């Protein structure tokens, strides 16, 4: 690997390397690890925790082949399979604020009329609170159904507005997370947080690939950060096609 360019390619997971909450295809996995990694350094950055990333990357062995794995926006950092850093939102904002956010979110969601509601509406992670109006235990069909409903009725966008208004004096940020949820995290703990683990001298360039790169999306900040070259993708297949073009892979 000594002949690799001193460049890091960072990839979002959902919508970029996989369909939302699904496994990476065998074709794209092999392409990344055999073709892309032989040319540049590769890393993952996701709002999900380590176990979910491992599931989507088709196992821990595959996950650990990436040079960097930034879980929960980089608040948890693995380098070549070794845990390097881990922090907690609870330590940062405290129990009182945490409960205020959760109580408000549950109250707001209780008034929503949706095509379906299931379970696991609030998920506590090291770096964030993940809030899901339909419930994370929904089936794939229910997930897709909510996603279509959300695009029409702006359920999550309105939810973000309500959270921002309620907690405007807090040091918290709110963003659309993946396909069905809202992420709540300390301001500055978006995906740009992962860049704090990469020294300025480590790479000549850092390229980021993501699908939620417009304002309000959870890729927006890192996509627009001065330290990265941002690339918007529309699907895992589009990611592959762009990589083939940038790296001259036939």
Where are these regions (language model features)?
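Short, flexible loop segments at the rims of nucleotide/cofactor-binding pockets, characterized by
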Residues: 18-22, 47-48, 184-186
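Conserved acidic, metal-coordinating active-site core of Asp-based
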Residues: 115-207
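Short loop/turn segments at strand-loop or loop-helix junctions that form parts
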Residues: 11-14, 72-74, 125, 132-136
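A generic structural motif
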Residues: 37-41, 169-173, 203-204, 226-228
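Asp-based phosphoryl-transfer active-site loop
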Residues: 4-23, 69, 195, 219
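Active-site phosphate-binding/coordination module
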Residues: 23-120
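Mg2+-dependent phosphoryl-transfer enzymes with acidic/Ser/Thr/Gly-rich catalytic loops
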Residues: 2-5, 25, 185-250
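A short, Lys/Arg-enriched amphipathic alpha-helix followed by its capping loop at the start of a domain
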Residues: 3-10, 27-40, 166, 201, ...
């Amino acid at each position: 690997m000594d002949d690799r360019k001193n460049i890091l390619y960072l990839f979002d997971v959902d919508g970029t390397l996989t369909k939302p909450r699904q496994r990476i295809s065998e074709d794209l996995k092999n392409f990344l690890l055999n073709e892309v990694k032989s040319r540049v350094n590769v890393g993952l950055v996701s709002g999900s925790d380590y176990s979910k990333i491992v599931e989507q990357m088709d196992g821990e062995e595959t996950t650990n082949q990436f040079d960097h794995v930034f879980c929960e926006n980089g608040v948890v950092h693995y380098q070549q399979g070794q845990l390097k850093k881990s922090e907690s939102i609870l330590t940062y904002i405290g129990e009182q604020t945490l409960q205020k956010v959760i109580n408000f979110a549950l109250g707001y969601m209780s008034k929503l009329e949706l095509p379906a509601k299931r379970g696991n509406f609030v998920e506590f992670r090291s770096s964030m609170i993940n809030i899901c109006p339909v419930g994370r235990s929904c089936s794939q069909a229910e997930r897709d159904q909510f996603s279509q409903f959300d695009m029409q009725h702006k359920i999550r966008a309105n939810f973000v507005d309500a959270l921002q208004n309620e907690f405007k004096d807090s040091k918290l940020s709110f963003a659309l997370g993946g396909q069905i949820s809202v992420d709540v995290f300390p301001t500055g703990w978006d995906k740009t947080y992962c860049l704090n683990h990469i020294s300025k001298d480590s790479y000549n360039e850092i390229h980021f690939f993501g699908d939620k790169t417009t304002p309000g999306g959870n890729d927006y900040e890192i996509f627009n950060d001065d330290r990265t070259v941002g690339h918007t993708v529309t699907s895992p297949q589009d990611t592959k096609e762009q990589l083939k073009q940038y790296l001259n892979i036939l």
